[in-house]
Amino acid sequence: MGDKAGVPYDGNDPRYQDLYHGKADSADYGWLTKNPVWQKEWLASITELIDMYKPDLLYSDCGLPFGNEIGRSMIAHYYNQDMLKNNGQLEAIYNCKEASLGRFVRDVERGALDSISEYPWQTDTSIGDWFYSTGQKYLSADQVIQMLVDIVSKNGNLLLNVVQTPEGDLEPDVLQILEGIGTWTKDNGEAIYGSRPWKKYGEGPSTTTKQVSGNHGGIKDVRPYVAEDIRFTTKNDTVYAFCMNTPVSDLNITSLSQVSRISTKSIASVSMLGSKEKIKWKQNEDALLIVKPSILPNYKVVVFKIVFKK
């Protein structure tokens, strides 16, 4: 069918099976083949890739390939080779789409987790479609930032696809999104980079309403937020409180109240990242009160740096 009908293709030629693969069994219609010959060929190919190119990261767009015997053999070889390269320190990262229990980094496509994970994990998603198409709609910079913050607050990492034209260029809308993310990161990056999840990931309506399921597991990664929705990260003696939408009034963060069992330390200072304005605040019995700043940035997610007394 089509303009390629009748054109010879060497992938269909049995003489070239070593370059491609053998003829598929009509009953073998799963995402991963059951053919043991091809499984061993795959393992040999990935082993060669690891040995020759020593990748920092490997990603499988599926669960653990071909079950425990093949998949775990590949991971063990990958990790062992990486430790030889790094004087006994494991720095390699392997992603695949199933729960890992720390054996590798779980990937959730177009979704997120609904709570803090003991083990690092990853969301992979796109600002639009996976590939370019004329007239497609993109996420806004604010939506990407909200998604990033929610993921990081739960011990996750965001792998973001940025759509390019067939020529490898970026459309003006895409450039604007990246510039918006860059502006926010310049002001608030310290609350993301090198941070860890706090004792809870957040508070507000988004933590109590029923979660919408994601496309490939987990919960939906892009969702609406209000100013009362808060996310947390921590670093040293500091907690960062992300207000997930533009504050319209004073903030009351109940997780940081005087009597909160979550935080037993007294607060020394509160500031807003990216601003020199002196923030008015008070740690009350029922909540940490933060008076709405007189000047707010152009982006939606505002970050407050809360330093505890030592």
Where are these regions (language model features)?
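Mature catalytic domains of secreted/periplasmic carbohydrate-active enzymes
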Residues: 1-310
